[in-house]
Amino acid sequence: MDTVSLPQLPATVLVTIAKLVAPADLVSLCDSHPQLVFLRLYLPEFQDIPVGSFRKYGPSDGHFCPELYFTSPVVHQRVGSITLTFRWKDQGFGNRKGMLWIELVREGQLIATSKDDFPTLAPHQEETQEIVIRNHPVVDLIRKGDTINFMRNVGGGGGHSLSVQEFNAKLELYKY
């Protein structure tokens, strides 16, 4: 039996394979041979990361007490923008300290953060937010293999809480 390399397969077979494999595997396949680059057309344009909801109470001491909310799956494509949508509010009175932001992480090292550029504090009354991040280092510097940390600060000092409902992150992905 003769051996056939992937680039020698008919385009219809390669397209079928591209439609069936996970995006991370398709990126690896495309990177494996110059004649397979056309299969990038079958990469997704968006990646939704639905997370859900939480209600968190802050510690009795401290003011800024950042913590990891969750980490994204490993990114396999370049990213054009990140859109965060959610409903949120704090405890409803007193000082406002609740915050959400993202951090770009590569091999365990912080590369960029959006904390100082999107310093919105949670309101006393529930609000719906849509934050679109583009042309910012947390997006522009993303490379294959990176992760995105989604961070939160409830705020310390007693009585602080942060409630986030229906949190979703949507990554706009580049195919090339």
Please state what every model-predicted region is.
Residues 1-42:
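N-terminal Skp1-binding subsegment of the F-box domain
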Residues 34-36, 89, 107-109, 155-156, ...:
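Conserved beta-strand elements of beta-rich interaction domains across eukaryotes
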Residues 37-99:
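Solvent-exposed, flexible loop/coil segments flanking beta-strands in beta-rich domains
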Residues 68-78, 136-142, 176:
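Extracellular and analogous surface-interaction loops
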Residues 83-84, 98-103, 143, 147-176:
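Exposed low-complexity, polar/acidic, P/S/T/G-rich flexible segments that act as propeptides
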Residues 96-133:
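Terminal beta-strand-rich extracellular "head" domains
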Residues 124-128, 141-147:
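Glycine-centered loop/turn motifs
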Residues 130-140, 156-157:
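Signal that preferentially marks extracellular ectodomain short beta-strand elements
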